[in-house]
């Protein structure tokens, strides 16, 4: 039975924040850049280079000397020529690594002894001006140019070393410093671009950054899903085979003059495989698959939604043939004119652009649009017309055969016990979607792993089904014996009424183990498969069964001791009764539908008069009261069976169909439950005896201590 639950939900929102991680990245990039620039400046900075004359030689009238540099890479290779221009002038031609020679001139001078002195001092080389000075002196004993050039070279050799600046490094450095502002600008632009991608979205994703505004967020992928991977849905898959054939052979349809399929919309309850079917179509056809959501088109800026629609279809045209899949299309394709956000609704702009792209002036050959929604009735009529979404395929909840197939698909790689019948599991899971069935198998696997077992048994499956229906068991919850017994009466009341009313359902399980907000629950399933049609007698039986819990409480404890545990039962019963009166024509008000069973009613619309509203309320109350009286009568006339169900629940906490049917048919406890009862009684006697002995021992100890004192 359910406990009252508040309806208030707290909502939280995250404010975008500047990511600290991005700030630190920018800081370290700047530090690294500064270090690199410093190293380059140190390497390329002009510096004095020490050179030494390595060897010299005379070739005819030309004297040459080779100079070896001592500064790493830069080697000065030759003093090419040393010749006398006149008796008074000596010219030395110097070149470095193939650079045009630099001419050095030394003028004749006379020292105090009358010797001719050629002073070549303070060698410095500037390649831009062509000037060079050699530090040292050359001495010429003779006063005329009489072939004694060798002496001049000897004099130069005797100088030993001289200093030559690396002027090429200066040129390289000038080029580097010229490019440095551009390099810094490019690096900072890249850093800003990377950080902006995260800053605008709070550092969370690329989808909300300032550089992606107006671009579609659809993901392009190749699908590996095939129809064979999907259990059930045979008719739905058959309908989609035409789309697959068109994507594979578009020319065949063009030659016959057939209009290519524009779109397919899949609608039905959540978890039934709509997205999986769309992926299977793309996988079977072997074409690209663009996946997006309806809400992914919208943004806080006006016009962004329409721009993203255009961008998506432009990309799809380039990748054609392909499939565009829009999940939850109702967020962008809802009926226009219901709620006006402004004079020109932003949402309507996006919808209008989508309508134009799907069937506008531009051709869209090779692009098939598939969409999924849980509510077809809220979509705009223009979106659903032929030429846009040509096919409307309903994806229903799987029947018993399809549930068995889905369970087999998900159990392929699981080690199930041989005692497990997937058909029985399918019978116990009516109304389950494919996603819920997958969750049942996964939960059972997790339970087996938790117990360090390599095989999944039926207990794991049972517990997994309970978890999916009502949540995990709250075995640690402290429940008094009185409350535990009250819950047992409540759930036994549901089961007892369900066993005695004329209904297509049968009771499968009763438990008083708390789960979620429920203190216990009773599981009923259809006797013969899944019926899409419900008779009036079935609906009345469902109401009576729902009221069985409150009827048992009032019958056993009285009207003043009833509890809030029946709130969810009343909710269920009231909804069924209201549908019978206002939609199904199963009341004294006649065959009239007062509330549309499909579509939505605009706010403020009045569908019936005040008197009719009173009549509807009266009929709903009359149906519920009649079925409540019926439930009270069943409980009164079958009190012994009720007590046996309660006793079995208090002993075993959970009883299954076999035990329930045994009690119903034989009006006594099943042998297994009886054996558990005897074990519990024996255990209680042993504990009572032990407690009595302990108490006696304590009294004897107290007497001995008093005697000694």
Swiss-Prot record:
Residues the entry annotates as binding Zn(2+): 490, 494, 569
Q: Where in the cell is it found?
A: Cell membrane
Q: Name one GO molecular function term.
A: zinc ion binding
Q: Where is this region: Disordered?
A: 673-709
Give a Gene Ontology cellular component term annotated to this protein: plasma membrane
Q: Which residues cross the membrane?
A: 26-46, 172-192
* Keyword Metal-binding annotated: yes
Extracellular-facing ranges: 47-171
- What PROSITE patterns would the database entry show? AAA
Q: Could you tell me the membrane topology recorded for this protein?
A: Multi-pass membrane protein
**Cofactor(s) required, per the database record:** Zn(2+)
Question: Which residue stretches are annotated as topological domain Cytoplasmic?
Answer: 1-25, 193-709
Q: What does this protein's record comment on cofactor binding?
A: Binds 1 zinc ion per subunit.
The UniProt annotation places ATP binding at 268-275
Q: Which Pfam families match?
A: AAA (PF00004), AAA_lid_3 (PF17862), Peptidase_M41 (PF01434)
For this entry, list what GO says about its biological process: protein catabolic process; proteolysis
Group of enzyme by EC: hydrolase
Q: What does this protein do?
A: Acts as a processive, ATP-dependent zinc metallopeptidase for both cytoplasmic and membrane proteins. Plays a role in the quality control of integral membrane proteins.
| Family indicated by similarity | In the central section; belongs to the AAA ATPase family. In the C-terminal section; belongs to the peptidase M41 family.
Q: What is this protein called?
A: ATP-dependent zinc metalloprotease FtsH
């Amino acid at each position: 039975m359910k406990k009252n639950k508040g309806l208030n939900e707290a909502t939280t929102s995250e404010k975008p924040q500047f990511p600290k991680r991005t700030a630190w990245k920018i800081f370290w990039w700047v530090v690294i850049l500064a270090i690199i620039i410093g190293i380059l400046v140190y390497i390329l900075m002009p510096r004095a280079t020490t050179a030494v004359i390595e060897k010299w030689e005379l070739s005819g009238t030309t004297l040459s000397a080779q100079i070896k540099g001592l500064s790493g890479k830069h080697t000065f290779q030759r003093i090419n020529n040393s010749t006398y221009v006149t008796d008074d002038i000596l010219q030395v031609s110097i070149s470095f690594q193939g650079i045009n020679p630099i001419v050095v001139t030394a003028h004749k001078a006379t020292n105090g002894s009358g010797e001719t002195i050629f002073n070549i001092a303070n060698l410095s080389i500037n390649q831009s001006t062509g000037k060079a000075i050699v530090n040292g002196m050359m001495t010429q004993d003779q006063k005329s140019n009489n072939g004694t050039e060798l002496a001049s070279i000897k004099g130069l050799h005797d100088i030993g070393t001289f200093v030559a600046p690396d002027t090429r490094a200066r040129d390289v450095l000038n080029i580097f410093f010229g490019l440095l502002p551009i390099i810094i600008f490019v690096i900072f632009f890249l850093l800003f671009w990377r950080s902006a991608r995260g800053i605008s979205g709070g550092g969370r994703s690329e989808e909300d950054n300032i550089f992606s505004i107006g671009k579609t967020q659809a993901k392009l992928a190749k699908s590996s899903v095939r129809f064979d991977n999907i259990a059930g849905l045979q008719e739905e898959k058959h309908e989609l085979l035409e789309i697959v054939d068109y994507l594979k052979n578009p020319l065949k349809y063009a030659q016959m003059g057939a209009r290519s399929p524009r779109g397919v919309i899949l609608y039905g309850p959540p978890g039934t495989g709509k997205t999986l079917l769309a992926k299977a179509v793309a996988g079977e056809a072997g074409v690209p698959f663009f996946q997006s959501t309806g809400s992914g088109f919208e943004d806080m800026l006006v016009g962004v939604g329409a721009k993203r629609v255009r961008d998506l279809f432009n990309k799809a045209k380039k990748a054609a043939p392909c499939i565009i899949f829009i999940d939850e299309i109702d967020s962008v394709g809802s009926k226009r004119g219901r709620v006006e956000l402004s004079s020109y609704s932003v949402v309507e702009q996006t919808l209008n652009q989508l309508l134009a792209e799907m069937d506008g002036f531009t051709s869209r050959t090779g692009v098939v649009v598939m969409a999924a929604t849980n509510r077809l009735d809220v979509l705009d009529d223009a979106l659903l017309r032929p030429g846009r979404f040509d096919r409307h395929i309903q994806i229903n909840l799987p029947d018993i055969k399809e549930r068995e197939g889905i369970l087999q698909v998900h159990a392929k790689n699981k080690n199930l016990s041989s005692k497990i019948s997937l058909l029985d599991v399918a019978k116990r899971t009516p109304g389950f979607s494919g996603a819920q069935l997958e969750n049942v198998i996964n939960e059972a696997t997790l339970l087996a792993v938790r117990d360090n077992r390599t095989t999944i048994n039926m207990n794991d499956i049972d517990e997994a089904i309970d978890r999916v229906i009502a949540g995990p068991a709250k075995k640690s919850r402290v429940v008094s014996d009185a409350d535990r017994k009250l819950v047992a009466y409540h759930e036994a009341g549901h089961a007892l009424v369900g066993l005695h009313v004329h209904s297509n359902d049968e009771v499968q399980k009763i438990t008083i183990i708390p789960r979620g907000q429920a203190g216990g629950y009773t599981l009923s399933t259809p006797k013969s498969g899944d019926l899409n049609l419900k008779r009036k007698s079935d609906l009345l039986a469902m109401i009576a069964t729902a009221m069985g819990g409150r009827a048992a409480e009032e019958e056993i404890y009285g009207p003043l001791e009833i509890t809030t545990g029946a709130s969810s039962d009343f909710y269920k019963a009231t909804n069924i009764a209201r549908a019978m009166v206002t939609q199904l024509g199963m009341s004294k008000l006649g065959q009239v539908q007062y509330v549309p069973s499909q579509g939505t009613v605009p706010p403020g619309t009045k569908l019936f008069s005040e008197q009719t509203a009173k009549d509807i309320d009266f009929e709903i109350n009359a149906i519920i009261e009649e079925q409540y009286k019926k439930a009270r009568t069943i409980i009164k006339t079958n009190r012994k069976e009720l007590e046996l169900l309660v006793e079995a629940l208090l002993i075993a906490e959970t009883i299954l169909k076999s035990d329930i049917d045994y009690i119903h048919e034989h009006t006594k406890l099943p042998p297994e439950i009886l054996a558990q009862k005897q074990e519990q009684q024996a255990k209680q006697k042993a504990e009572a005896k032990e407690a009595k002995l302990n108490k006696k021992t304590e009294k004897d100890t107290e007497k001995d201590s008093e005697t000694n004192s």
